[in-house]
Swiss-Prot record:
UniProt-recorded name of the protein: GDP-mannose transporter
Annotated transmembrane regions: 43-63, 72-92, 113-129, 137-153, 163-184, 207-227, 242-262, 281-301, 310-329, 333-355
Polar residues bias spans: 368-381
Source species of the chain: Coccidioides immitis (strain RS)
Family per record: Belongs to the TPT transporter family. SLC35D subfamily.
Compositionally biased intervals (Basic and acidic residues): 1-25
Length: 387
């Protein structure tokens, strides 16, 4: 402290001497102006633009997928995912050739190691599209929070992780918001059907299918993320390396799955792509593929300009506009229970993010269960995952 204080006083004295000696110096030479470049650099380093870009790309991705899947007759889910993967590969390869991004070239040994992760990714995205087809965007977003619980306890079992009391409280809020959302959905289905037998049964069965797909999606998502953590440790992949291998290895599987499972008759194609909306649907499919690239870029931009803590908070706050987008663009029912579920789910995300911040600051305070010390590499991998 004494040395620091001496240095501070010395700095102040030198500033005074410099100020007094300015009058004996010749006038400074005019410097060339770089107003435009400095202005653009200040904008790119401002935290506002990357945060807004990340939120916008997340909303666009969800809304475009819902727009494609909301068609009554749409059932080509494997084809949709294949188009998105192809668009993503073309986009990032173009960016790499232009020198905007960089990632590893294809390696067969790395592809073999990463192939199981690509299978899990296909399962995660496919079940997500099926759930989004049957459920509204707010309900889908709320139930997606349950994945956080599975990942947290998966870390406890596989990586020596821990769950704090505050995180446990946020998990309770997540479960509560999911129960409220399901109750609101079922109540609205019964009210709109007038409690008539056939129509009510049809709507309830549709919701039940959505809940089942959502449960499978939560399991696939948590398994994918936990498995990816272990594989990244082996391959040392970066963000764009992961994106490249995930999409490239997924394309042949999705193509085979689409040709084997899905109906490619002319009648079914006309049902999936009606003439009056065909162009807009194709554009939405391509745009959703580009949105995945935007999300990866803007998330990395957000972490670089701000911090991983700010990024995790933005991810929690972003659930609110995503849920509201369903109410705005798709006419999802606006009722007291549905809005309450959104609010509780939003609060649970905030509480969980704060719990992670406190846990990283004081990792041994109020931790459940008690864990043994872990290695630095394991701790860094744990901190790198921001659910």
């Amino acid at each position: 402290m004494a040395d620091t204080k001496k240095n501070d006083n010395y700095a102040i004295d030198m500033d005074k001497l410099d100020a007094e000696s300015d009058r004996f110096r010749p006038p400074p030479q005019p410097q060339p102006r770089h107003s435009s470049s400095s202005h653009s650099q200040s904008i790119s380093n401002s935290p506002v633009l990357p945060i807004l870009s990340y939120c916008a790309s997340s909303i666009l991705m969800t809304v475009t997928n819902k727009y494609v899947l909301s068609g009554v007759q749409f059932n080509l889910n494997f084809f949709l995912l294949c188009v998105q993967s192809v668009v993503c590969i073309i986009a990032i390869q173009t960016c790499k050739s232009m020198g905007l991004i960089n990632y590893r070239d294809f390696n067969s040994d790395e592809a073999k190691k990463w192939f199981p992760i690509s299978l899990l990714l296909i399962g995660m995205i496919y079940t997500g599209t099926k759930a989004l087809k049957f459920l509204s965007i707010p309900v889908y977003t709320i139930f997606k929070n349950l994945t956080i619980i599975l990942i947290a306890y998966g870390e406890v079992l596989w990586f020596g992780g821990s769950v704090t009391g505050m995180a446990l409280f946020s998990f309770g809020l997540m479960v509560l918001s999911s129960v409220i959302a399901a109750w609101a959905d079922i109540k609205h289905a019964l009210d709109t059907s007038g409690f008539s037998g056939a129509e009510a049964t049809s709507k309830i069965s549709t919701l039940n299918a959505g809940y089942i797909w959502m449960l499978i999606n939560c399991l696939c998502t948590s398994t994918y993320i936990l498995g990816m953590r272990k594989r990244i440790k082996l391959t040392n992949f970066k963000d764009f390396d992961t994106m490249f291998y995930n999409n490239l290895l997924s394309i042949p599987i999705l193509m085979i799955g689409s040709f084997i499972v899905e109906d490619w008759s002319s009648e079914n194609i006309n049902k999936n792509f009606p003439i009056e909306t065909r162009n807009s649907l194709i554009f939405a499919m391509i745009f959703s593929g580009l949105s995945s690239v935007f999300i990866s870029y803007t998330s990395a931009w957000c972490v670089r300009v701000t911090s991983s803590t700010t990024y995790s908070m933005v991810g929690a706050l972003n659930k609110l506009p995503i849920a509201l987008s369903g109410l705005i663009f798709f006419g999802d029912p606006v009722t007291v229970p549905s809005v309450s579920a959104i609010v509780v789910g939003f609060i649970s995300g905030i509480v969980y993010s704060l719990a992670k911040v406190k846990q990283n600051a004081k990792p041994r305070t109020g931790v459940l269960p008690t864990t043994n010390p872990v290695s630095a590499s394991t701790q860094s991998m744990r901190d790198g995952l921001k659910s």
